[in-house]
Amino acid sequence: MIIDFHTHFYPDELAPKAMKVMSEASGHTLYGDGTYASLVRFMDEDGVSLAVNLPVATKPEQVVSINRRMVEWNQKQSRVHCFATYHPDFPSVGDMEEELAFLAKHGIRGIKIHPEYQSFYPDDARLVSFYEACA
């Protein structure tokens, strides 16, 4: 069994813009059109059985909506397991703990943070309570 542990897909309506932004920000050529269907097509072509989708919230106000979509995707298909996202500027410790409880309840197995796209260092003090809550 082959598992691709680092993939990205976006809702169909957001995929074109997301792919453009990600390509420009990373300086890399991206493959496919950024949709779930495109990801599964590449998986089938390459003999990949399972994949993990790693969403990134570039703004704190995106965290909850992205995470709800990831839970929905996990409930309606089984080829790609979606992780959640978190942002260092998420509103409060209480909100963060509530969000983590929601994610655990719905079977989310990991959370993606991205220092480069979210403008922080891994040892940033804003993340201490997040790391502790995840432990």
Question: What are the roles of these predicted feature ranges?
Answer:
Residues 50, 58-135:
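Active-site gating/metal-coordination segments in enzymes
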